[in-house]
Amino acid sequence: MVPVLLALLLLLGPAVSEETQAGNYSLSFLYTGLSKPREGFPSFQAVAYLNDQPFFHYNSEGRRAEPLAPWSQVEGMEDWEKESALQRAREDIFMETLSDIMDYYKDREGSHTFQGAFGCELRNNESSGAFWGYAYDGQDFIKFDKEIPAWVPLDPAAQNTKRKWEAEAVYVQRAKAYLEEECPGMLRRYLPYSRTHLDRQESPSVSVTGHAAPGHKRTLKCLAYDFYPRSIGLHWTRAGDAQEAESGGDVLPSGNGTYQSWVVVGVPPEDQAPYSCHVEHRSLTRPLTVPWDPRQQAE
């Protein structure tokens, strides 16, 4: 589930920027609620991230906040009983909001999804940004603007949500204080337990493979995997000249705290020029070049 959730997080807010990867830090939360849960997909789940690394999760079945590795081995980082109680309270409010939206649209029988993402960033130990937004069935629903401060409705049903969440002036001030004070404070508290993991550099392993059907062009694939941080440069060269990839280029989580990426080029049958995969990553002292050996051809 984590890779899918991380993709949603990137859509909902700027929690994991390349600048963050360069030494700044972020704390963010992703909530997902389902009107019709099914096996393996509970009605509510929450995942918390430090930078791009999930560090605890919670769902409506276990109703406990549970730290993920390597934070599961850390003592004193968080009071997990207290965090569990907080997540249970947030679950109740979150699912009540989903129910209100379904009532507004008079669709209690449909299958609907409500998602929320919020968090903050530190740069040089100072607050440098924050976000808080929700989506309903994949469409923007409501967001918090801390500069006004106010909830900004992005859907007709969100007018009701705004009225409810702004019924008392203190509600808005609490949301603003959370983004500007509480969230950065939590992040500062977590960092002494987390910097070693978040600042680590893991070099990519690189594999080049090829396949050709009789009478067709040869397809070369360069796969880089098990690298961290996320940013990587990856391309094929022909006799030293960079080639445009036919496919690939995305950087995806591997599920173990590292990333993977690949690029594919097509080579005409008559082309005998040397091809190499060129890799640039922060963990490497110099770019890595891995030549394609035609003897490795996979039939």
From Swiss-Prot:
Ig-like C1-type domain residues: 204-289
PROSITE patterns linked to this entry: IG_LIKE, IG_MHC
Positions of glycan attachment: N24, N125, N256
Top-level taxonomic group: Eukaryota
Record's subcellular location: Secreted
Keyword Glycoprotein: yes
Keywords: Disulfide bond, Glycoprotein, Secreted, Signal
InterPro entries: Ig-like_dom, Ig-like_dom_sf, Ig-like_fold, Ig/MHC_CS, Ig_C1-set, MHC_class-I_related, MHC_I-like_Ag-recog, MHC_I-like_Ag-recog_sf
Residues in the signal sequence: 1-17
CDD domains linked: IgC1_MHC-like_ZAG (cd21010)
Family membership noted in the UniProt record: Belongs to the MHC class I family.
Function noted in UniProt: Stimulates lipid degradation in adipocytes and causes the extensive fat losses associated with some advanced cancers.
Protein name per the record: Zinc-alpha-2-glycoprotein
The gene coding this protein: AZGP1
